[in-house]
Regions:
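Short S/T/G/P-rich N-terminal loop/turn motif that feeds into the first structured element of a domain
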Residues: 1-67, 87-93
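A common structural junction motif
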Residues: 25-28, 71-76, 81-82
Length: 93
């Protein structure tokens, strides 16, 4: 299983994020997408306040998705929200 993990520095506006999902996330081919608030950390303040995850069954599906116009457009729109974020790709066993 492959995941793209997006960590937002602050929580996005709920209406704006709903628009982002409807217009830019839903067109991306993936087996699952989830998102939510970060509510804590065992080591003081959390490093981020909101997370999102895309999930793919295999590397081939992941590569097809991240090289798509839809994935690029989603990243551009995420940047347009003006919230600093990081993206990590992970292979989950």
């Amino acid at each position: 299983m492959i995941r793209a993990i997006i960590q937002y520095e602050t929580e996005p506006d709920s209406e704006r994020y709903a628009q982002h999902i409807a217009e830019f996330v839903q067109p991306i081919e993936c087996s699952a997408f989830r998102h939510g608030k970060v509510f804590g950390s065992p080591f003081g303040e959390p490093a981020c306040r909101y997370v999102a995850e895309f999930e793919w069954d295999d590397m081939e599906s992941f590569k097809a998705a991240v090289n798509s116009d839809a994935f690029a457009a989603s990243g551009k729109d995420a940047m347009a929200m003006g919230i600093p974020f990081t993206v990590h790709f992970a292979s989950i066993e």
